[in-house]
UniProtKB/Swiss-Prot annotation:
Induction: Positively regulated by SigO and its coactivator RsoA. The gene is yvrJ. This is Uncharacterized protein YvrJ. It comes from Bacillus subtilis (strain 168). InterPro entries: YvrJ.
Amino acid sequence: MTVKDFDSPSNRLPTKLNEGKQKKVNYYFPPSVFQNTLQQFTFYRFSSLTYMTAEKEGRYFPMDQVFIEEVVKQIGNLGFPALIAMYLLTRFEKKFDQLIELMTELKDHAKK
């Protein structure tokens, strides 16, 4: 990703240098946060769902009219811990489902 990917009209910062002018302000993000971790995530935009894949396993997130620019902005606002939490939830979703099934079976077995 380049700086142009993160630059948009909503990312323009008013300062005394560019006040009253339409000067473009580029935001520079630490490469270790965005370039390394966002390569593992791929976002696809649909009309009512966003599909996020992590290492070839994916899930749908019910988000209305989500644009990749807004998703990247939210990741930037929330920070690195939120990005890691999203990654872990996506990676371990199947294991959590298996754990819930095993807990339900254990609960049913304990009732007998």
